[in-house]
C-alpha cells in the first residue's frame, strides 16, 4: 500500500503536502513515529488492504485516539478493503484501496 499512498500524495501536490509513513512491522510497532507524524500534520488517513472491521488500521486509529487526540484537526480516516469476503482476481481492483480513494479521503479530511 505504500506505493499507492505515495501516488496519492503526488496527486495531492498543489492542494496539500502529505507525509507517507510506512509501518514496516506490526511488532514492534513504531508508535513514536506514528504519534510524531500525527502531531506534525494534524491529520491522518490510514490505508490498508484488509477489510475495515477489526483490521490493524483500527488499532492504529485507537492508538491515535488515546494518545494524539489533541494533536488532530479532524477524525482519523481509513481507506480499506470492503467488509466483504475477498473477491476473485477479476474484481480485485474494485475491492482494493485505490489512489483515487486515498486522495479523496485526504481531500475530505482537509475540508473537515
Question: What does each of the following model-derived ranges do?
Answer:
Residues 1-112:
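Thiamine diphosphate
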Amino acid at each position: 500500500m505504500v506505493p499507492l499512498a505515495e501516488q496519492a500524495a503526488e496527486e495531492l501536490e498543489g492542494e496539500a503536502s502529505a507525509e507517507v509513513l510506512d509501518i514496516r512491522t506490526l511488532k514492534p510497532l513504531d508508535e513514536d513515529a506514528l504519534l510524531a507524524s500525527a502531531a506534525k500534520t494534524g491529520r491522518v488517513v490510514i490505508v490498508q488492504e484488509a477489510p475495515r472491521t477489526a483490521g490493524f488500521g483500527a488499532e492504529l486509529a485507537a492508538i491515535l485516539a488515546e494518545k494524539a487526540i489533541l494533536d488532530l484537526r479532524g477524525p482519523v480516516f481509513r481507506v480499506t478493503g470492503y467488509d466483504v469476503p475477498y473477491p476473485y482476481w477479476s474484481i480485485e481492483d474494485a475491492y482494493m484501496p485505490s489512489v483515487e480513494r486515498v486522495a479523496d479521503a485526504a481531500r475530505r479530511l482537509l475540508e473537515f
